[in-house]
Every structure is written in C-alpha cells, then in structure tokens.
Amino acid sequence: MIAIVVSVFMWLLAACLLVLRRGRAERNITYAALTIALATTLNIDVVYRTLDALAGGVNLVTLLADLTLMTGVFFLGRGVARASENQPLPIRFALSPVALLVALGLAITAFALIERGVTTTTFMLDLGTQSAAAAYSAIQFAYYGIVLAAMAVLGARQVQISAGLQALSPGVLVAGSVCGIFLSIVVIAMDLAHLSGNLALMTAIDLAYSPLYLMTFLFLCLGFASGPATRTVRAHSRERTARMLSVE
C-alpha cells in the first residue's frame, strides 16, 4: 500500500513539473521525479512479480528498481545544487556523478553476491541475514543519507537568503531531507539488527520506517512542486498588475 501511495505522489509530481517547468533549460528535477516515480512503481507487488517473472524470477527487478531510485536521488541533488553557489568540496563530491557511479558499482557488486532464490516482494526480510544483502541495503541508504544531507545544507542556506513565499520550497525540502536522513539511519540500523539476529530490535526500529518513508517523499514532493508553483503564481500576479497599470 505504501509503495502505491508513494508512486502516486511521484507521478503527480512528475506531471506537475512537466507542466510548470515547461520550457525551462534545467531538467534535473523533472528527471528525478520521473526516475523515482518509475522506481516506486517497480516496487508495487503486482508490477514487481510480473516483471520479475519475465526476468527469470531471481529478483533482478529489485536491482533495477534500486539502481533507478539511486539515479533519481542523484538528479534530486543535482537539481538542488544548480540553485546554489559556492558549494563546499564535500557537498560537490556528494552530489557528483563520481559518487553515484561508486555507489552503483558497490551496490551491483553486493547484489551479485546475494543468494537470491526465487521472486520475493519482501527481499530484505527474507534475505537480510546474508551479509551481502545487508551490505547491499546499507550501501544504498548510505548514499541516500549523504545526498540528502548535502541537500539539507544547501536548502538551509537557501532559506536564509529567501523571504516570504520564496522560503517555502527550500524549507519544505530541508524537512524532507532531514526525514530522509533519519530514514537512512533507521534502515541501516534494521539491516545490522537483522544481520546480527536481533529480530526484536529490528521489529522495534521498523515502527519508525513507514512514517519516515511517507514523510520523506511527501515533503520532497511538496518542496519540489511548490517552487515552480510559487514562481508561476508570482508571474501571473506581475502580469495582472502590469495590465492594471497599463489600463490606468
């Protein structure tokens, strides 16, 4: 159910951005919305089972969905970076293609070492006792956490130099990024608890997963949609004011 809700959020965001950002040269945010929407759609159970059966029934769609999501998060970070100047070196590296390629390479390597068995829609729950599976998940969420931390820093800087409605979009993005950082920490903690056999701890930590997952995507969607929406409203307001002045 959560996968469906998040997928709907992301496709709505993609549709909004395609309309509101029409004609703009900067496309990173639109690419991010489309790739993340695709990744979340691949994680819907019925879609996953159907496609994985076509791919041989060995959970290859898990890898496809996860690599797509990592790429989408990369585009998110690049989109935020384009709106900021004088970025520190650690932030530039965190949001660079090199960091993405390193993370993708590590994730693919870890995935190849997992004894995956047949199709399962609860991949980490079923296979999380394998060290390769724990590493595979941790690599992804470490990358997400790093990118989102960089986004939070850039967003906070943007809030400081903005006023009124202009501060809304970066402020909501900071909230989404912070939720995503905590989500990454929660997932890595769950991976370690599962790997160590402490299922009680894993279950306790899991209580935070769904709320953080939903809040992360909700705030990020609102943040990225509110930016172009605010600019559109302001543009219409300026046009209306100009017409009124010309009539006078």
Question: What does each of the following model-derived ranges do?
Answer:
Residues 1-11:
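Hydrophobic transmembrane alpha-helical segments in integral membrane proteins
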Residues 104-146:
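Membrane-proximal helix-loop-helix units in multi-pass membrane proteins
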Residues 84-113:
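The cytoplasmic-loop to transmembrane-helix boundary for the fourth helix
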Residues 56-68, 127-142, 204-211:
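Short aromatic-rich membrane-water interface segments that cap or initiate transmembrane helices
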Residues 149, 168-248:
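C-terminal transmembrane-bundle signature of multipass membrane proteins
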Residues 29-51, 65-74:
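A generic, lipid-embedded transmembrane alpha helix
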Residues 21-42, 134-191:
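Alpha-helical transmembrane segments of multi-pass integral membrane proteins
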Residues 23, 38-62, 118-124, 190-191:
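Helix-loop junctions on the outward
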